[in-house]
Amino acid sequence: MIPGLINARVTFHNSPVHALERFTFRDVGAALEGFRAGSGLDECVIVQTCNRVELFGASASPDMGSIRRTWASLAGIDESLFGGHLESSGGGEVLEHLLRLTSGLDSMVVGEEQILGQVKNAITSARTSGASGRRLNTLFDRAIRSGTRIRNSTGIGSGGVSVGSMAVRLVEENMDDLHSRSILLIGTGEVSTLVAKSLGKRGYDFSVASRTLQRSQAFCSAMGGSPVLFEDVLDGFGGYDVLFVATGAPYFLVTYDKISEVLESRGGMMILDLSNPRTVDEKVATLGGIKLMNLDQIAEMVSKNMRNRMSSVGKVEQMISGEVPVMEAAMNRLDAEPIAEAAFKEADALRRRELAKALQMLGNIGGNDAKVIDDLTRALVESIMSAPMNNLRRASEEGDADVVDAAARLFDYRRPG
């Protein structure tokens, strides 16, 4: 049991993605400040992506009603809009949910990598602004480390699971030094967007051609790449080492004759036909130096990778189940640490005062003798304090609030606030 932790969220699980925008915060920094000022939270972290808006909070007694009202005010919406979209968790459930996030289990695409980086950015922003403190910093740091370890040991995030990422990965596997190659993307639709995202993420330069230059320019403004004239491309495939073709054209854009001409003046080329129906003449594959792959082949590889990821889900859930009690003990121990630190500090201050008196009474005592006495008194204090402090930490890990409260009274420790 971990009192004082709360998570409130609107995600793709309980809201259409297109409707999530109304629950987002235009200024996350201002929202962090607003939640602390308006909902009674001592600490908070906001994880906001295209698929989720989540608030993690810590206080003595989190109040969901206050959080809901503050959220509505900060997002500029009526509280009634939450309806059944807003979901919440408390205590140990918060730990489990955050582990599911960092391990990729709660993502729309199971195992996707982006969420781990987004969680890291969220805690970094909260820490920098002072919105998070000892409890949430510890929670997020441990969840990020555990999520990374779970991903590495289970392979939940391995393999491409979009046509775009798989297509780019195949090119990387088949062509050396892709950064020095010229890449052309024909088309500006959904599949082209996936390809462009994957190319951009890996730092590759690429050109984009569409039916109109304006469409190519708009696509490149949003997704990266350099727009080129469609007509120039059709007459000059020879300028490219890699072609990604993803259009809805009802005819072959890339023909056998055009590629034959290209091969007379250059070496090999890799062509990925991601169109449906196909827009690359299959006879192109018979030409020496040409590597052609079509949408069906790539989609089958994506399906295989997705099946592999799903087969790892059980192992991930098992590891999360084992990690939750470990994290819960670590979080509970936080209640004991300031008491133990204060008790040790007070005991050492008393030791040093009495040591100074004793050394003064002894008079002309040598430096080495003084060090021996200093070491002796320090060892005595640490030995005397060690057992009760370890027992205090153990009681705290087990959630025994009575022992922690009793220790605070015995050592005259006053909690902040």
From Swiss-Prot:
Catalysed transformations (reactions): (S)-4-amino-5-oxopentanoate + tRNA(Glu) + NADP(+) = L-glutamyl-tRNA(Glu) + NADPH + H(+)
Keywords attached to this entry: NADP, Oxidoreductase, Porphyrin biosynthesis
Binding site for substrate: T49, C50, N51, R52, S107, E112, E113, Q114, Q118
Pfam families: GlutR_dimer, GlutR_N, Shikimate_DH
A biological process term (GO) from this entry: protoporphyrinogen IX biosynthetic process from glutamate
Domain notes: Possesses an unusual extended V-shaped dimeric structure with each monomer consisting of three distinct domains arranged along a curved 'spinal' alpha-helix. The N-terminal catalytic domain specifically recognizes the glutamate moiety of the substrate. The second domain is the NADPH-binding domain, and the third C-terminal domain is responsible for dimerization.
Oligomer and partners: Homodimer.
Protein name listed in UniProt: Glutamyl-tRNA reductase
Organism: Cenarchaeum symbiosum (strain A)
Annotated gene: hemA
